[in-house]
Amino acid sequence: MESTFLQDNMFFIIAAIVSGGMLLFPMISRSAAKEINVQQAIKLINYENALVLDVRDDGEFAEGHLPNSKHIPVERINDRLQEIEKYKDNPIVIIFRPGLRAGHAASVLRKNGFNKVYNLSGGIDFWKRDNMPIVRK
């Protein structure tokens, strides 16, 4: 019985396609916002009136957040855009816990006309690591 290359190697071909997709997904999901470090975020907050948008869930936010940050969990960002509409022309620094939440939040903001969207590289973990101020609720 003769078989073709594709039939003999179907498992490896599927594994290669899935692996490639997994490698590309983080790059695609983060492309909506520029990543900035803690020092760059501080400059935007202090000198350009940036809105700090915390997209973590309620429990994570209560454990500690940046002073004067606006809390909108990523799951509710579409429903609550009107709350931040006045900041469309300001930089927005997204605070998150590492994962895909920041990429999703940035995509929603960009699609709705927010052009200066930034993700804090490392999220809240890097902010804490650098001993920056945290407010606890």
Describe the role of every protein-language-model region.
Residues 54:
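N-terminal glycine-rich beta->alpha transition that marks the start or flank
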